[in-house]
């Protein structure tokens, strides 16, 4: 039996999905039900010590909670996500990867969102697979390994 030693960096959309699972969301859209079911199955199969989110993702999640109509409840749900997914700190190598990735994208006439660029740099610097349902955006980043747990 092989033990998976891959570290996973969950992007904001993946963490929002986990928040919905923890919350016990019951979406009406069958496609969304299927996506959450697949996400839950994959998330449950990975040891907790292999699951991370970037501090950038944590900031995006907190921003969403702050602007919520019910910020206290939203923050409480985020605390549950925080218990399930560790925050991966950044070091100097993240900045180095950011600069190289941004230069590469500009040279090739490509762009990705600012926060996604930081998440990609963080994942690549730490040799993590980035978990996202936004493969179209993240696939533009060379040498970044990604998975979509909702597909």
Describe the residue ranges of each PLM region.
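Alpha-helix capping/helix-boundary segments
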Residues: 14, 94, 119, 136-137
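Active-site neighborhoods of divalent-metal-dependent phosphate/nucleic-acid chemistry enzymes
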Residues: 2-7, 85-131
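Generic structural signal for small/hydrophobic residues in well-ordered secondary structure
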Residues: 11-12, 61, 98, 123, ...
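Nucleotide phosphate-binding site architecture
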Residues: 15-16, 59-62, 88, 139, ...
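Short, well-structured N-terminal submotif of metal-dependent ribonuclease cores
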Residues: 1-53, 65-80, 107
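A general structural signal for well-ordered alpha-helical segments in protein cores
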Residues: 58, 71, 75-78, 95-98, ...
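Short secondary-structure boundary segments
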Residues: 55, 134-135
């Amino acid at each position: 039996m092989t033990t998976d030693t891959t570290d996973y960096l969950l992007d904001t959309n993946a963490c929002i999905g986990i928040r919905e699972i923890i919350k016990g969301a019951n979406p009406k859209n069958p496609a969304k039900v299927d996506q959450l079911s697949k996400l839950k199955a994959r998330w449950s199969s990975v040891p907790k010590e292999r699951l991370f989110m970037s501090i950038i993702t944590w900031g995006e999640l907190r921003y969403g909670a702050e602007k919520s109509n019910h910020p206290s409840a939203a923050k409480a749900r985020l605390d549950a996500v925080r218990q399930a997914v560790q925050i991966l700190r950044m070091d100097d190598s993240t900045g180095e990867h950011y600069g190289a990735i941004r230069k590469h994208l500009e040279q090739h006439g490509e762009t990705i969102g600012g926060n996604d660029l930081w998440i990609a740099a963080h994942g690549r610097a730490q040799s993590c697979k980035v978990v996202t349902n936004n493969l179209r955006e993240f696939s533009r980043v060379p040498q970044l390994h990604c998975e979509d747990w909702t597909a």
